Amino acid sequence: MQNEHESTDIIRIDHLNKTFGDVKAVNDLSFRVKKGELFAFLGVNGAGKSTTISILCGQLSKDSGTVQIKGIDNERAGEQTKRLIGVVFQDSVLDKPLTVKENLKSRAALYGITGQAFEKRLQELLDILDFGDYLNRPVGKLSGGQRRRIDIARALLHRPEILILDEPTTGLDPQTRQVIWNVIEKLRIEEQMTVFLTTHYMEEAANASYVVILDKGSIVAEGTPYELKNRYVQDTISVYGVSEAQIKSLHYDYKKVRDGYRIKVDNTSEATKLIVEHQELFQDYEFVKGCMD
């Protein structure tokens, strides 16, 4: 019988390994993804993110370890677990000469979604992703942001419980990236989906429920964004209207900034204590919590 924690794990990976020649792409990887959360897989290119995704989706065989989706081993019941997953690949897999609707229709047919069932699902996705203005436009004539919306729609046709996004905003400008993230968050809430994100953008991981950081195929850190910031990032206090001699007397690391000084502190508690003990210096100040960057 599963305990309470196990029953909420929609993805369970234990001691996963994958080697390409002499390169250990995935090295004894173990982690959990909770149902309904935004899970972030963070790391630079070559860290092992895409390899793990390919194994999770059943596109690549593992050397050893286990991968379970909703308690089902994805190697023993590959087709069953594949229907639980929708994937947005880093490189779009849409057919550029075909229109948006033609792309979605041909993909839906692979899941047995045809006729009125397809038209109904298409309308639902139009309402969520708002691509009606270019439904009949060839994919090759879409902007990067528009194409990304269709990539997401394609992944959602069969109503998966897990949406995997492999570097979904790479190559997009900051404004378009934000638009895509607004769409993804809306999806997660309205469709009650689990979102598994791979990214090398720190600011995207900052919005996640849980973050796993990879380097050379191994986990080097994990936790909620709050836990990671408290563990690895220093907070700062910017103080104005004081002399450098007064700042030096505090015996903290600091640097000169415009109109003041920026002091490094380990956490909020330390900042509060410092301010209370030296109220005469902290008449004009700004406390900034460390960020994922």
For every predicted segment, state its role.
Residues 159:
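Conserved catalytic motifs of ABC-family nucleotide-binding domains
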Residues 65-73, 80-81:
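Conserved ABC transporter NBD signature motif
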